């Protein structure tokens, strides 16, 4: 009984325990996509590692959580892959996974030390408006719309998708400067 009391006092930030990247990508309840290559899974894991070390240890155990944190926690990722290697596809998967992981939190803004309910923004910036709309954003939007897990948790607009908990993914391009003032967690430069 005392252990239950201590467990209740713990600062649990999660509304739902997130699934691993492979389950998220391939699972019918999530994206339901074909499996990725090992390199693509590593890219997705590195791009989407947003959790604190202590939370990873709680989910995965001391050794695995620490190793995961050390391997995948990055501030910047540069993909230098050839044409047709799946950079845009992998980026849309990673962005989807980040949004999923944010929505698993009770209050994503508070988790990152921001005021409760504060905006969290993710953006893809392409060279021009057509590329912004037809490459990354189209693939991202399709994944979200087809995923049973995201049903009822978003509102799609022409150049953005607003999710519950004040999370927004924007499609931008370098021809305009309206991206100032965003609370960016992720920026994908295409």
Residue ranges, per PLM feature:
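Phosphate/NTP-binding elements of NTP-utilizing enzymes
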Residues: 1-190
């Amino acid at each position: 009984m005392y252990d239950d009391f201590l467990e209740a006092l713990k600062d649990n930030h999660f509304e739902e325990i997130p699934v691993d990247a492979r389950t998220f990508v391939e699972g019918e309840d999530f994206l339901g996509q074909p499996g990725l290559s090992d390199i693509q899974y590593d890219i997705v894991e590195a791009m989407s590692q947003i959790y604190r070390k202590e939370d990873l240890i709680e989910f995965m155990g001391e050794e695995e959580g620490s190793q995961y944190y050390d391997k995948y926690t990055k501030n910047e990722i540069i993909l230098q892959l050839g044409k047709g290697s799946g950079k845009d596809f992998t980026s849309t998967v990673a962005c989807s996974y980040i949004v999923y992981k944010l929505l698993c939190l009770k209050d994503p803004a508070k988790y990152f030390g921001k005021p409760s309910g504060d905006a969290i923004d993710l953006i893809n910036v392409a060279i021009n408006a057509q590329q912004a709309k037809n490459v990354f954003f189209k693939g991202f939007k399709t994944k979200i719309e087809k995923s049973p897990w995201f049903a009822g948790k978003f509102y799609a607009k022409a150049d953005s998708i607003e999710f519950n908990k004040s999370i927004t993914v924007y499609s931008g391009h370098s021809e305009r400067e309206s991206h100032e003032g965003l609370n960016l967690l992720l920026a994908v430069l295409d």
